[in-house]
Amino acid sequence: MYDIAPRRSGSRPGPGRDKTRRRSRFSAAGNPGVERRASRKSLPSHARRLELCLHERRRYRGFFAALAQTPSEEIAIVRSLSVPLVKTTPVSLPFSLDQTVADNCLTLSGMGYYLGIGGCCPACSAGDGRLATVSREALILAFVQQINTIFEHRTFLASLVVLADRHSTPLQDLLADTLGQPELFFVHTILRGGGACDPRFLFYPDPTYGGHMLYVIFPGTSAHLHYRLIDRMLTACPGYRFAAHVWQSTFVLVVRRNAEKPADAEIPTVSAADIYCKMRDISFDGGLMLEYQRLYATFDEFPPP
């Protein structure tokens, strides 16, 4: 029963009366009380992000479920989008560039490895002005005329000089073997005209299909392959596969045959003797030669993908 005894105006209820009123409210609710929801400020940041993501997913689930019932409307909606729904996709290494599409760029860094969309990539937009237009015909012409521009290819040729010294192999014979794979020269030419990146090139025998593999070593702690560079390399080198990998914190692009491929009849042969004679006039930088010696020692144990 309730206490109906009169009390003086302005007096406060006693502690017993206050407890009785609280108990009566809890009993009326039929449970021990209403649990207060934790405020967002009390949740960790990752929990708040997860809550927001779940809220957005529930918000748009019905819309996309309805679109899935009518493929024509779904395609029309996608075509009308001016900004991609997903701008990056994480990948794992080793990663084959054959898995890319025409507009994909590749970013490798300590923060992760992911494919981007060239049209929405700030790095690709910044590098557009530095990209030279290189067709397969232009690459073949550069390969045939390299004796006239041999100094421009000294970074590529210096690696062969170091490799010949390491294995006590005649440089002219090694040069003849690599000239038998013009695609390796194409990769060097494409990357050399591809912007600020200044990669190094290592040559290793291919135990599977013969010839040589090319390791493209990227300097620094990150690497970015412009979507046009990827497209040009894949187009210029049919029959070759490209795999991005990392070895001892250094990013590398491995270029190797994917089958026993005969010489391309469209590409004229180049005299190794003429190139060798011209190379003897080049004074290779001592720092570059030491760098190649260190890189070969580092990648001797690297298992190519």
UniProtKB/Swiss-Prot annotation:
Keywords: Host membrane, Host nucleus, Membrane, Metal-binding, Phosphoprotein, Zinc, Zinc-finger. Phosphorylated at serine residues in the N-terminus. This phosphorylation regulates the localization within the inner nuclear membrane. GO terms for biological process: viral budding from nuclear membrane. One of its GO terms (cellular component) is host cell nuclear inner membrane. The keyword Mitochondrion does not apply. GO terms for molecular function: zinc ion binding. Signal peptide: none annotated. It is found in: Host nucleus inner membrane. A zinc finger (CCCH-type) spans 105-224. Residues 1-42 are annotated as: Disordered. Belongs to the herpesviridae NEC1 protein family. Plays an essential role in virion nuclear egress, the first step of virion release from infected cell. Within the host nucleus, NEC1 interacts with the newly formed capsid through the vertexes and directs it to the inner nuclear membrane by associating with NEC2. Induces the budding of the capsid at the inner nuclear membrane as well as its envelopment into the perinuclear space. Forms a heterohexameric complex with NEC2. Interacts with capsid vertex specific component 2/CVC2; this interaction directs the capsid to the host inner nuclear membrane to initiate budding. This is Nuclear egress protein 1. It comes from Human herpesvirus 2 (strain HG52) (HHV-2). The lineage of its organism: Viruses, Duplodnaviria, Heunggongvirae, Peploviricota, Herviviricetes. The gene is NEC1.
